[in-house]
């Protein structure tokens, strides 16, 4: 187990009250959170979303990506179903960090795509480790999930970490003139299942 649970509290949102759980990585003290809505029922697959941190999309409403819209869609869907979990995965910029993400944005402004920009900076296309999320599911005694994702890598890593995914539910964001190239790159180079 790479994480320990630190605390939980009520988090009122526009979609209702969630419980917010705080976790800490044992090796480096990095924090992660999970938002739980409603009751977790043993042996019943729960709707789940792993949302990777994206300050630019989540807090500043950037149109370069689909992150902020996906966060809102996931919280709304979880609340409308009556229960679910959203893990806020603190691995900004596909785990290259905020400042490197800004450098990658600058390279994208010069014509590189999101994968090429990461590689130019010395990173792989996706540096994230979703095994931390499996630890959160295990700490909260969640064994079976219905996963809101377009990312087959996320599905594979969770299954390899012992989480049973009974259904993959797409979370599709409409293209706009700012994110169309980014979404196309995610589909073509990273295998994301973005189009109906």
Curated annotation (Swiss-Prot):
Pathway: Cofactor biosynthesis; riboflavin biosynthesis; 5-amino-6-(D-ribitylamino)uracil from GTP: step 1/4. The keyword GTP-binding applies. It catalyses: GTP + 4 H2O = 2,5-diamino-6-hydroxy-4-(5-phosphoribosylamino)-pyrimidine + formate + 2 phosphate + 3 H(+). Coiled coil: none annotated. The keyword Transcription does not apply. GO terms for biological process: riboflavin biosynthetic process. InterPro entries: GTP_cyclohydro_II, RibA, RibA-like_sf. Its cofactor is Zn(2+). CDD domains: GTP_cyclohydro2. Zn(2+) binds at residues 54, 65, 67. GTP binds at residues 49-53, 70, 92-94, 114, 149, 154. The active site is at residues 126, 128. Keywords: GTP-binding, Hydrolase, Metal-binding, Nucleotide-binding, Riboflavin biosynthesis, Zinc. Gene3D superfamilies: GTP cyclohydrolase II. Belongs to the GTP cyclohydrolase II family. Catalyzes the conversion of GTP to 2,5-diamino-6-ribosylamino-4(3H)-pyrimidinone 5'-phosphate (DARP), formate and pyrophosphate. Homodimer. PANTHER family: 3,4-DIHYDROXY-2-BUTANONE 4-PHOSPHATE SYNTHASE, GTP CYCLOHYDROLASE II-RELATED. This is GTP cyclohydrolase-2. It comes from Buchnera aphidicola subsp. Schizaphis graminum (strain Sg).
